[in-house]
Regions:
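Pre-active-site segment of Zn-dependent metallo-hydrolases
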Residues: 17-62, 73-78
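Hydrophobic beta-strand segments of well-ordered beta-sheets in folded domains
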Residues: 58-61, 83-87
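Metallo-beta-lactamase
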Residues: 84-109
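Residues that flank catalytic or metal-binding motifs in active/ligand-binding sites
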Residues: 6-8, 82
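Active-site environment of divalent metal-dependent phosphoester hydrolases
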Residues: 8-11, 26-28, 66-71, 93-96
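Extreme N-terminal starter segment of soluble prokaryotic enzymes
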Residues: 1-3
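Active-site beta-strand termini and strand-to-loop segments that position acidic
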Residues: 12-16
Length: 109
């Protein structure tokens, strides 16, 4: 199953795993609240949180880059991070991975 979450976000679910891509779910928007999701999608954030909490599947979240409309740290902090494996591209600087490591997830690669 593939579900569009708005903006650049997708949820992909198989029999064994769940993969989230660039989940931007915060009600506060991004860039000092000058950008908002259209249409609004923050109500899906609770659904995703429930899926993560209730599943025994392996969970991966892919963060494509550090812009706040792709790397929604306030929302990520609301998730059960000890169950989540984060995947990031190799960047010249390690800002995304560094922030993710501080959240104490299951893994960051």
């Amino acid at each position: 199953m593939i579900k569009f979450l708005g903006h650049a976000g997708f949820l992909y679910e198989t029999n064994n795993e769940i993969i989230l891509m660039d989940p931007w779910m915060s009600k506060e928007g991004a860039f000092d609240s000058s950008w908002y999701q259209f249409p609004s999608n923050h109500d899906l954030g609770d659904d995703i949180r429930d899926i993560i909490t209730d599943t025994n599947k392996e969970i991966y979240i892919y963060i494509s880059h550090e812009h706040k409309d792709h790397f929604d740290v306030p929302y990520l902090r609301t998730l059960e991070l000890s169950k989540i494996n984060f995947i990031t591209p190799k960047f010249r600087r390690d800002h995304v991975a560094s922030v993710l490591h501080k959240l104490n997830p299951k893994s960051v690669t």
